[in-house]
């Protein structure tokens, strides 16, 4: 008798889980599509790219000035008095240090100004995207929405559940 009750309880549990699973509605978005087609995200990326290009140009100028000074030093090395050699060497060391400091300050992985600026510029963009995703999820009665282009691996996705363009539309309409 206990054996039959156990089997019946397993069957009911299985039926209950199957019923619960059929009520789940899952969708996905491709955040890369949103970031490349939504005007606010495009502008933000353009601003970040402009800043990166500006700092890269400054770094290139500093490096070229250093290389020119090092070449001049090498050419004049044999004719320079000892005190001038020492001063030129100190200048070169200082220039090299300035280049390294600038590179670290602007571009250091995770701590450089470019990463801080990225977070600052894209924080409101991400908030708007998440808000639009939430609205679409509620409108569509979805329980879960995954990002197809994120770290979550999505091995198969039926395009019927793709809500990327609904989210993009919501962002473009500003609602």
Residue ranges and their predicted role:
Residues 21-175:
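Amphipathic, charged alpha-helical segments and their helix-to-coil junctions
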Residues 17-18:
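Hydrophobic alpha-helical membrane-insertion segments, chiefly the h-region
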Residues 4-14:
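Sec-dependent N-terminal signal peptides
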